[in-house]
Amino acid sequence: MLPDKIYAVYFSGTGTTKKTVTRIARRLADGLGAAYEEYDYTLPDARQRALTIPAGALAVVGCPTYAGRVPNLLMPYLRGMVRGGGALALPVVLFGNRNYDDALMELSQLLTAGGFTCIGGGAFVGEHSFSRTLGAGRPNGADEAEMDAFADGLAAKLRAGDTAAVTVGGCDPIRPYYTPRDRHGNPINILKVKPKTDMS
C-alpha cells in the first residue's frame, strides 16, 4: 500500500536541510499522489510538542551533521518526542563538505527506536553552517538532480510494494563526535564558533 501522506520534518538552522528535505518530500508526494505536510522543529518551541506520524504515512526526517553525528541538541527531541506509530521513514542528513560519518546511521537508529520503518536514507552536501566557503552554493543544481533521482527511486520501490527496512552505513556502536584538529594533529576547541541562524 502506498503512503497516503508525505511529511517533511526538519531542523534547518541555515536553510539547506529544509531545502533538501522539502524537495525530496514534495517530489515523493507528487510522484505518489499523496498529501504533503511540513513540520519544522528548528526553533526550541517546536521541540516542546510531540510529533506522531501515523501508520500509512511516510516521513522524510532531516537534520544537519555536526561533528559527524546528529546534533546533541536534537537528541532529546528525536529520542523522546518523535514517534512513528508504524509509519515509514526516510532519514536525510546534510553535511558541510567534510563527511557525514555516523549521522545517517544514528538518525536511522533513532527513528527505528521511535516506531518507524526506515526504507532508505540519504546524505547530501550543504553549505557549511560556519563558513560560506565550504560547500559554497550547495545544494546546487547537480545536487537537486540527485535528490530528484533519489526520490524517484524511492517512489519506484514503494510502487513495487517494497517497504522493507534498510541498513545505512556508519559505525555501530556510534563513534564519539568528531574532534577538529590543527595541522599538527592537536585538538581544536571550536565551541566559541557560532553559526548564523536564519530566523525567518
Regions flagged by a language model, labelled:
Residues 1-19, 23-43, 49-192:
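FMN-binding flavodoxin-like domain, especially the glycine-rich phosphate-binding loop
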Residues 197-200:
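Iron-sulfur cluster-binding cysteine motifs and their immediate structural context
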